[in-house]
Amino acid sequence: MKPVIALVGRPNVGKSTLFNRLTRSRDALVADLPGLTRDRHYGEGRVGERPYLVVDTGGFEPVAKDGILHEMARQTRQAVEEADVVVFIVDGRNGLAPQDKSIADYLRKTGRPIFLVVNKAEGMKYTAVATDFYELGLGDPRAISAAHGDGVTDMINEALEVAYAGQPEEADEDDPSRGIKIAIVGRPNVGKSTLVNALIGEDRVIAFDMPGTTRDSIYVDFERNGKKYTLIDTAGLRRRGKVFEAIEKFSVVKTLQSISDANVVILLLDAQQDISDQDAHIAGFVVEQGRALVIGVNKWDGLDEHARDRAKADLTRKLKFLDFAKSHYISAAKKTGIGALMRSVDDAYAAAMAKLPTPKLTRALIEAVEFQQPRRRGPVRPKLRYAHQGGQNPPLIVIHGNALDAVTETYKRYLENRFRETFSLTGTPLRIEFRSSNNPYADKS
């Protein structure tokens, strides 16, 4: 799984600036989708071939006893417990503060690898910056400027060396013995553990790896109708006798790790509750990660016709950016609707991994343009020439032509819908990238 880097520090030391610098590559990949809710406290970064998750914990007040500061401190402690590396940020311009000492006292007791980072160090001598902070007892401070990027690359490379050294070896992605990797995600009490037991059943379990610590992942390999699957734990599921129970509190970090590791995500909602911001945040991360998706609306059996209509309208209104995914109305407890749900998992995975030949893509593009031309921007009308596939999981379609920066978001969504219809790309995000050139065939040699 992707390692987790937690950014910790008192307010206004530059955590958000460092977070934005570490995760900027992700922001550029996904266009703003209508209704998409993002939680800016969580993001993904990458150095070379090494991806990682970043958690910005907010201002940390370790001794806060109540109110919003107490809740923020609780969330910070949970993030620290689940992080592979903690980056403790202090302010080099203002020097050591009493609150820094309180945070350092707490962090030393956690047993986590701690990187002490002195921010806002631009234009200052290292010795002058670092001297004050040695007394925190966290080793050599690392001087950076999050705003200008100075020292950030070296720091994150060091942090990733430590983080990846503690990661277990993962199975080969192409290992045929491993099935489709499924993450079942959702807020607490929506029925995740009930769905797990309905899917797996005692006789279908092939292997179960009990984790050594609460930070390790559970992978459950199982078969259903002759097909292999691997379930990734997202909810702190632990085995009790012959069933799994959710015995841990909801963990954002584990949810994000599981989504990143999955081939297909099942977003489980509670039909008897309104869709929350937390549901939308989880859904937004699924889209940003480009994961295939199926929506399960659980506890459907307990609703009358009026309540069902209301639940469907709520789903359409609040999660409209998930219109590429199929929704299934199920009862995990009564095991109804689960067969159709799993067929959609298979379809979503097939769509995410689909191979799209260049001649067929180009033909679909030309037909779409003939049916509806892109609008002019001033005197310029975009010319869309040909298309090829640039990647899978999710599918990336690269369109070549002239003046493509004039293509509107509305027309881009029109093309996406045409490609989805032509190639049956249901259940997966679809990326479209435009590349303009004077001679659209110049790079086809």
From Swiss-Prot:
KH-like domain sequence ranges: 354-438
A GO molecular function held by the record: ATP hydrolysis activity
Keyword GTP-binding: yes
The organism's place on the tree of life at top rank: Bacteria
PANTHER family: GTPASE DER (PTHR43834:SF6)
Similarity comment: Belongs to the TRAFAC class TrmE-Era-EngA-EngB-Septin-like GTPase superfamily. EngA (Der) GTPase family.
Protein name per its UniProtKB record: GTPase Der
